[in-house]
């Protein structure tokens, strides 16, 4: 009995034995934690994140790349495209203005209006349409601007369609599937625009055609001889 009590006292009373037990446990825990490796999913996440190119944004399966191969949003690129668009508008305006007749001649006086003969109606309409074609086009554009201003939703749809067209034309990073999706969205918005704004478009085209036919029918035709036509007179 005395030997057993002495052995117990030496085991529980000796601090070196307890320290050795604790140290061995801590060393085992440290070795286990050091040898542990993260799950495979956690290791693959940085690789997936790094596979996305920098400077690109994905929306609905379409990647809007801002790099050199996509649409660049740098000030120099934007200014270049704006200058190209404005130059085309100026060229179109210059060409139309050169063929635009004097608006006083277009409106005319009472003496320039009269009922045409039935056999001369077709020739009169043809001559006036050829002579005043730029004036009729300007009237159509004025009606179109009024139509768009009074319907902001149509302006939004046209802006989205224009953005998709420009992006598809300039982007070189889209895959075939992404291009098909973009073309599908463009076709859907175009059909929706025609269905939603069908009555307004019919009114726009109908009003322009009625004014053109009435004016060309009752206005006395001017000479369409190239030697007597002076483009841009009075503009």
Swiss-Prot record:
The gene is prafA. The keyword Transmembrane helix applies. Belongs to the PRA1 family. Keywords: Membrane, Transmembrane, Transmembrane helix. It is found in: Membrane. The chain crosses the membrane at residues 144-164, 187-207. GO terms for cellular component: Golgi apparatus; membrane. This is PRA1 family protein 1. May act as a general Rab protein regulator. It is a multi-pass membrane protein. Pfam families: PRA1 (PF03208). Its main location: membrane. It comes from Dictyostelium discoideum. Residues 1-17 have a biased composition (Polar residues). Residues 1-55 are annotated as: Disordered. Residues 24-48 have a biased composition (Low complexity). It comes from the Eukaryota. InterPro entries: Prenylated_rab_accept_PRA1.
